[in-house]
């Protein structure tokens, strides 16, 4: 047998997991190719073995667990839950992250190199800038496709609840709410029924208000066999879902098999949901566990109550408990009803008073059955649950789903009483048309065939019945009869039906809501007695076979049936047949073997039916006799007299009952019970149908209301829901039709009851849809009214108030009052805008949306204008205050020295600067206020006037600068005479008495402190008081020390700093020219301002939306486009959230910019990723056809999206280089940070190309993404033994990879994998030969010894590689040492080495290292965890030299002794004793030749290069 090709294996696996494969193939194969190409390097076999086969087992387990709770159903989508026809639910590859919105997620099988593929949930991270992957644990497969699982995920999320699942399809990505996805659909196929099991099935657990208990379920529902599963499985009823009337399949006429399967065709079912009072996560999967059995058959063969209506519990096994052996185990695992808080009132009472649908005319267990009586059945409807109805199996639009969500509950309104389960689903029995007729008949044998016979005429006294009923009145929940329904919306609550609580031995006196009367025409007692039996078989000609067995002699008080009664019964039996069988007529078999007396009216009735009708009802009359026929038959015409042995000429044994020698075991009593209920069901259906049609006509004829109306349930629908007949029909209809299938004549009967029932179902569904449409129209009108009200308010009062803020006022007090009013107005507007936008969320009214946006923009403009006017008025107020205060000081100072000091104080006061005036003038021009411009001119004139007065007072024109300098020099000499610690006297004693009080300086003004020239003046004018003069000068509220100069660059006065700018105490150092410093600071601030402005523009550009690639691009280019946009989105988040704020924080300290860049070095590595993706896009776009390429270039966003990040990177580098030139030589740390930042930015382009080269490696089975960061990539000439070749070498943190340049694919280079080594096994010899370009890498842990000599293209490349490898090996050695110490401590050994007591000469090996050889290699050959001793730090190159004659074999030394020798070597190679415990390893400097230690930290010794044997094993490159 030939092995299956890989392609066929992949397709067969996908076809098994995702049926139908012809619909899912386009989506799945595209995902397969994507994963094969990206993850498995186009290796289909490895993909199949490592990914697809494990994924198949994982997905099969998920599917099995999800479908286990619906055992017995026929799924509408056969691939659920993995796919819904062409829509794939569980993805095999990642979806484009741009399609994810808040609340969206999707499931994916994620490949992994280290382990088997796993299932993961992918969604947007809380920040929104990246995709978050949440692994799904294997134990979650049992409840993955449940609402509870997603609720558990949402509990762990801080923000943003997940609710919508993404499905991939050939047409694109689809969105489906999780609540709908976890609810599978079930549909009919080939006219067969679907549902749970062919029995009375468990009701749903209502999801009522909190605190209401859940009712236990009857155990009889467990005894059914699911089709195809091979074992009995419990059926699960939906929990709190929308329930409708079960619909019935119409059989194909003329087909006995199809007629036999007449029943439900559309069972709309929503799976179970967790009830409000649930006790656990899996409560929805255990809706059937807490159940009470109804008992088994009595020993005398009587059927227990409920068994007459349950086919599942009795068709395959003697009792419901035996039919499902797991039922008792499941029941034992559930707590009792009392422990769960379930009150006895929530359960119904089994017995005569309140029997469930599963009960017929029988009494409680242990009570003999009373036949021929129908009065006790009238009370049975009181104990049946209520159901709900609505919806349709066909899918609705999303709009309909949303609007129908409120109406789902309409048909299942809860009543204010206790809960009662009220739903019974139906199961579809799939029958194979190719089976033998006998096999199909055997499958449909009713429960009565295996029931032992019991005398039907036995009837106990009435007292005995009551006594047994009193004993058996126990709380019992009964199954309802309505079926679940598929409806693609949210689940609704389950109806609660009022139940009777029977206390003591009294029965409820209340009548049921519907009085179900017996049919006054059909004699059901006659049917139940076995007088007329429609056997369900046919004769040799295909006519339906009906047997007549006259009863024994009647009691005197009982009268014989009349001719009309007999004729009516026969006509009723004939009417039950299918239309084709009605045309053929009946074959009557009159059994007179026991020679009973014939009822007088029997023969006239038969004769009448033989002659009447066209065609006649009775086509053939066969009389079975034992001896001579009775005298009454002598004159009867058209009868055939046969003996028992001649019956085979009439019908086959399979068509006859067992007392006639056939194989059929019939139960006339059971048949009569079922058909009596069917007759009452038809009466109910007709009444409900009339009521529903009237409601439909009323809804269709209702005109739209002119005034405002409340959104709610329409009144016609409320009337229908309040009709008790609908409740009774929902409660019993489905179960009755289900029981009808268990009758022995069901395959011959027509679809009349099912058609009528389905007609009611469709009418109710039409009513619900009309009601939903009405509610939708009401909500649309309500939303339209809300929008209109908001628009009217905006155009009326809102517009008036907004216009009032256009001219806010010309005074500060008025503006402040206006600001308060504007805040209240803005809050009101925002509330109305939010209300209108919520109403427009489901509409596409662009005009109204535009009106709202325009008004909001005008509101923002008004707010901006108001704030600018406030700022302008505050400036005017401060300027006037400064002028008034200065004028008052000058006026109050008088003349002389006091006036001079006041002028000096005002000269240093924080006057408004010229720049501030220009800024305020620009504000006034923007506001367009002439009054503001006039006020600005007035303020400027007053300030200039005050400045002129100050200049006049000081007399600067007559006072030369040299005079002030001479006074400054004299002040310096006078200060020296006072002593070094003598403080300068203060001017506060002169300024404070004449000053009205200190004032705080505005932040935008500057303060120029007093210089030394005026300090001397202060010395002369202010003698010391009490020997302790004040140490500071208090000027306008600011304290400045007398020995400190505070410089503000915005101060217009410069002469103050001239006296001390060049001294050693100056703030800028010794001998730096002041103007040069100012120029440098100004340039630095200019560069930082330009950098911040550039960053703001860049953030704005990144926030612009970027369109998705068009369909003309290849799938690979679209994926690369998506990856580039993903990196761009992460850059947007980083720059907008973090980096811009940090740059703004560096505005006052320009030279800190370099540290800011270095602090976010990891984030700037994203630019390398962007460079990689951009180069791939450029090469891919260059390979496109000219037409496609031209269409791409026409897109305006493509060039900016591709070029903007790299242009910004170059702009960063230029600004940092200029800032580095402006930094003084004395700022060494800042210059180093700036230089490192420039280098970081320049490396990104090269790192991006390196990453692109890593992806271009072909044939490598190692996942290079898991080998750490790529450190270097360069071409080398590699020498291995006698072989010399050119290789491109990649150095990762954990791997060294050799590759060969192959060529270009689509404009990019590709490399072929040759060899790879773990860096943990690597040793380094830094110098080989005399060229200065070679170094050696060797590996001890692999074979005997492998060594590779690498010749670089330049000394710089060689130094770069050796330095990086040395640092890498040092880090590994230090890390391994720490791990080894931890292991020793955990073993109780400790971290101090054990020292043998030996002679010093034996322990000292360093003396051997003092030889002077020309050159040798110092490298490392010890692997991880081999030795525990600490390493020797600080070794110099000379200390590691060995004599040339020493061979490597001579150094087979005890490594532990080497590590225990606690000695250090000085730089000259001499031995010096060291500490007992050496310090930790320190990496060498990049330029040094210190040997690099690999894992273990033990110094290994190697011989010279020329002494290596040529026979050493090597690995070909």
UniProtKB/Swiss-Prot annotation:
Sites of Phosphoserine modification: 262, 415, 929, 959, 1080, 1431, 1436, 1472
Biased composition (Basic and acidic residues): 426-457
Species assigned in the record: Mus musculus
Biased composition regions of type Pro residues, renumbered to the chain: 200-216
Bias (Low complexity): 306-320, 332-345, 970-994
Compositional bias segments (type: Gly residues): 353-363, 384-393
Biased composition (Polar residues): 490-503, 1502-1517
Superkingdom to which the source organism belongs: Eukaryota
Keyword Iron-sulfur: no
Coiled-coil annotated spans: 754-792
Keyword set, alphabetical order: Coiled coil, Cytoplasm, Guanine-nucleotide releasing factor, Phosphoprotein
Residue stretches of biased makeup (Basic residues): 370-382
Domain DH: 1083-1251
Gene: Arhgef40
Disordered: region residues: 194-238, 254-514, 952-1011, 1464-1517
Name the UniProt record assigns to this protein: Rho guanine nucleotide exchange factor 40
One GO molecular-function entry: guanyl-nucleotide exchange factor activity
Species lineage: Eukaryota, Metazoa, Chordata, Craniata, Vertebrata
Compartments where located: Cytoplasm
């Amino acid at each position: 047998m030939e092995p299956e090709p890989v392609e066929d294996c992949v397709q067969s696996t996908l076809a098994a997991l995702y049926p139908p494969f012809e619909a899912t193939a386009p989506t799945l194969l595209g995902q397969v190719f994507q994963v094969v190409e990206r993850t498995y390097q186009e290796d289909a076999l490895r993909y199949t073995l490592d990914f697809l086969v494990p994924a198949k087992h994982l997905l099969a387990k998920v599917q099995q667990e999800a479908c286990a709770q619906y055992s017995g159903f026929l799924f509408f989508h056969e691939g659920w839950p993995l796919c819904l026809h062409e829509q794939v639910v569980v993805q095999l590859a990642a979806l484009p992250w741009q399609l994810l919105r808040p609340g969206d997620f999707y499931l994916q099988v994620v490949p992994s190199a280290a382990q088997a593929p796993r299932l993961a949930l992918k969604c947007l991270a809380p920040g929104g800038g990246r995709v978050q992957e949440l692994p799904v644990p294997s134990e979650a497969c049992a409840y993955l496709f449940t609402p509870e699982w997603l609720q558990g995920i949402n509990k762990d999320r801080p923000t943003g609840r997940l609710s919508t699942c993404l499905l991939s399809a050939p047409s694109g990505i689809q969105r489906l709410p999780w609540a709908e996805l976890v609810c599978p659909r079930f549909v009919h196929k080939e006219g067969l029924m679907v549902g749970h099991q062919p029995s009375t099935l468990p009701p749903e657990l209502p999801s009522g208000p909190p605190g209401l208990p859940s009712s236990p379920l009857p155990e009889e529902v467990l005894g059914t066999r699911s089709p195809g599963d091979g074992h009995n499985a419990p059926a699960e009823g939906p929990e709190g879902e929308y329930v409708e009337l079960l619909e019935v399949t119409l059989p194909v006429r003329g087909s006995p098999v199809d007629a036999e399967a007449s029943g439900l065709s559309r069972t709309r079912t929503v799976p179970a949901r967790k009830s409000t009072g649930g006790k656990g996560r899996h409560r929805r999967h255990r809706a059937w566990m807490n159940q009470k059995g109804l008992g088994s058959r009595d020993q005398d063969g009587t059927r227990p109550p409920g068994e007459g209506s349950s086919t599942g519990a009795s068709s395959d096994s003697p009792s419901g408990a035996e039919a499902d052996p797991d039922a008792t185990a499941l029941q034992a695992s559930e707590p009792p009803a009392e422990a769960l808080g379930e009150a006895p009132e929530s359960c119904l009472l089994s017995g005569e008073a309140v029997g469930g649908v599963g009960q017929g005319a029988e009494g409680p267990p242990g009570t003999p059955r009373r036949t021929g009586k129908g009065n006790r059945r009238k009370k049975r409807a009181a104990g049946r649950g209520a159901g709900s109805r609505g919806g349709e199996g066909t899918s609705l639009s999303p709009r309909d789903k949303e609007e129908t969500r409120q109406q789902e509950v309409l048909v299942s309104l809860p009543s204010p009483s206790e809960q009662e389960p009220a739903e019974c689903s139906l199961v579809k029995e799939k029958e194979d048309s190719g089976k033998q007729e006998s096999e199909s008949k055997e499958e449909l044998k009713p429960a009565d065939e295996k029931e032992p016979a019991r005398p039907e005429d036995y009837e106990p006294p009435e007292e005995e019945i009551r006594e047994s009923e009193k004993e058996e009145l126990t709380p019992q929940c009964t199954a309802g009869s309505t079926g679940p329904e598929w409806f693609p919306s949210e689940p609704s609550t389950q109806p609660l039906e009022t139940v009777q609580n029977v206390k003591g031995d009294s029965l409820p006196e209340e009548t049921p809501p519907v009085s179900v009367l017996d049919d006054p025409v059909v004699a059901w007692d006659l049917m139940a007695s076995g007088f007329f039996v429609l056997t369900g078989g046919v004769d040799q000609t295909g006519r339906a076979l009906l047997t007549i067995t006259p009863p024994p002699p009647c009691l005197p008080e009982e009268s014989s049936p009349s001719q009309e009664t007999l004729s009516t019964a026969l006509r009723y039996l004939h009417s039950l047949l299918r239309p084709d069988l009605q045309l053929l007529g009946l074959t009557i078999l009159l059994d007179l073997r026991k020679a009973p007396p014939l009822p007088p009216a029997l023969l006239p009735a038969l004769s009448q039916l033989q002659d009447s009708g066209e065609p006649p009802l009775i086509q053939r009359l066969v009389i079975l006799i034992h001896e001579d026929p009775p005298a009454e038959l002598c004159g009867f015409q058209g009868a055939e007299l046969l003996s028992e042995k001649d019956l085979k000429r009439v019908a086959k044994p399979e068509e006859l009952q067992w007392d006639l020698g056939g194989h059929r075991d019939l139960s006339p009593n059971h048949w009569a019970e079922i058909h009596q209920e069917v007759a009452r069901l038809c009466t109910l259906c007709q009444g409900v149908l009339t009521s529903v049609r009237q409601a439909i006509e009323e809804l269709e004829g209702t005109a739209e209301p002119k005034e405002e109306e409340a959104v709610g349930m329409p009144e016609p629908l409320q009337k229908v829901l309040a009709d008790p007949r609908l409740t009774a029909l929902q409660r019993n209809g489905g179960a009755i039709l289900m029981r009808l299938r268990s009758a022995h004549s069901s395959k011959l009967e027509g679809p009349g009851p099912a058609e009528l029932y389905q007609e009611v179902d469709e009418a109710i569904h039409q009513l619900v849809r009309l009601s939903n449409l009405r509610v939708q129209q009401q909500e649309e009108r309500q939303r339209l009214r809300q929008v209109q009200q908001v628009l009217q308010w905006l155009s009326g009062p809102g517009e008036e108030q907004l216009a009032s803020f256009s001219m806010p006022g010309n005074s500060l007090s008025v503006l402040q009052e206006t600001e308060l009013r504007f805040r209240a107005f803005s809050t009101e507007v925002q509330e109305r805008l939010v209300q209108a936008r919520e109403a427009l969320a489901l509409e596409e009214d662009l005009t109204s949306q535009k009106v709202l946006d325009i008004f909001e923009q005008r509101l923002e403009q008004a707010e901006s204008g108001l704030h600018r006017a406030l700022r302008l008025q505050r400036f005017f107020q401060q300027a006037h205050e400064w002028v008034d205060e200065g004028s008052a000081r000058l006026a109050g100072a008088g003349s002389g020295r006091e006036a001079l000091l006041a002028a000096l104080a005002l000269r240093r006061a924080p006057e408004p600067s010229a720049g501030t005036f220009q800024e305020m003038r620009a504000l006034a021009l923007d506001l367009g206020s002439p009054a503001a411009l006039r006020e600005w001119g007035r303020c400027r004139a007053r300030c200039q006037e005050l400045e002129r007065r100050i200049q006049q007072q000081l007399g600067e024109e007559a006072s030369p600068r040299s005079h002030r300098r001479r006074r400054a020099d004299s002040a310096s000499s006078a200060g020296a005479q006072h002593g070094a610690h003598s403080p300068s006297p203060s001017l506060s004693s002169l300024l404070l008495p004449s000053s009205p009080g200190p004032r705080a300086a505005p932040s935008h003004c500057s303060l120029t402190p007093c210089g030394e020239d005026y300090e001397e003046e202060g010395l002369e004018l202010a003698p010391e008081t009490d020997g302790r003069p004040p140490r500071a000068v208090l000027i306008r509220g600011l304290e400045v020390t007398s020995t400190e100069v505070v410089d503000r660059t915005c101060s217009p006065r410069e002469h103050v700093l001239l006296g001390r700018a060049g001294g050693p105490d100056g703030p800028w150092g010794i001998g730096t020219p002041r103007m040069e410093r100012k120029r440098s600071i100004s340039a630095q601030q200019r560069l930082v301002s330009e950098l911040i402005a550039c960053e703001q523009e860049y953030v704005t550009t990144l926030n612009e939306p970027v369109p998705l690639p068009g369909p003309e691009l290849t799938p690979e280019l679209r994926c690369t486009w998506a990856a580039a946009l993903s990196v761009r989105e992460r850059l947007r988040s980083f720059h907008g959230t973090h980096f811009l704020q940090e740059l703004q924080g560096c505005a006052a300290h320009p030279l800190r910019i370099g540290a800011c860049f270095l602090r976010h070095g990891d984030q700037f590595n994203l630019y390398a990723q962007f460079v990689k993706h951009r180069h791939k896009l450029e090469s891919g776009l260059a390979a496109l056809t000219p037409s496609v390429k031209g269409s791409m270039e026409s897109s305006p966003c493509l060039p900016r999206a591709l070029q903007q990040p790299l242009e910004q990177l170059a702009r960063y580098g230029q600004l940092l280089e200029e800032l580095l030139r402006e930094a003084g030589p004395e700022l060494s740390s800042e210059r180093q940070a700036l230089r490192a930042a420039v280098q970081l930015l320049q490396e990104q382009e090269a790192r991006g190309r390196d990453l692109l080269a890593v992806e271009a490696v072909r044939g490598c089975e190692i996942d290079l993404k898991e080998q750490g960061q790529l450190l270097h990539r360069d071409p080398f000439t590699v020498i291995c033994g006698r072989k010399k070749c050119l290789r491109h070498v990649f150095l990762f943190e954990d791997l060294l990879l050799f590759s060969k340049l192959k060529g270009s694919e689509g404009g990019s280079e590709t490399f072929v994998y040759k060899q790879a080594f773990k860096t943990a096994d690597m040793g380094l010899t830094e110098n080989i030969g005399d060229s200065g370009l070679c170094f050696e890498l060797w590996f001890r842990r692999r074979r005997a010894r492998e060594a590779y000599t690498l010749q670089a293209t330049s000394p710089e490349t060689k130094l770069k590689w050796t330095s990086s490898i040395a640092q890498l090996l040092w880090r590994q050695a230090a890390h391994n040492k720490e791990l080894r110490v931890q292991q020793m401590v955990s073993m109780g050994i400790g971290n101090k080495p054990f020292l043998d007591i030996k002679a010093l000469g034996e322990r000292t090996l360093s003396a051997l290292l003092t030889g002077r050889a020309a050159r040798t290699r110092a490298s490392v050959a010890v692997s991880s965890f081999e030795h525990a001793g600490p390493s020797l730090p600080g070794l110099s190159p000379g200390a590691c030299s060995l004599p040339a004659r020493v061979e490597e074999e001579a150094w087979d030394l005890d490594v532990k002794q080497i590590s225990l020798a606690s000695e250090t070597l000085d730089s000259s190679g001499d031995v010096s004793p060291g500490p007992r415990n050496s310090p930790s390893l320190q990496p060498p400097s990049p330029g040094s030749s210190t040997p690099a230690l690999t894992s273990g930290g033990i110094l290994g010794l190697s011989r010279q290069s020329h002494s290596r044997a040529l026979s050493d094993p090597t690995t070909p490159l």
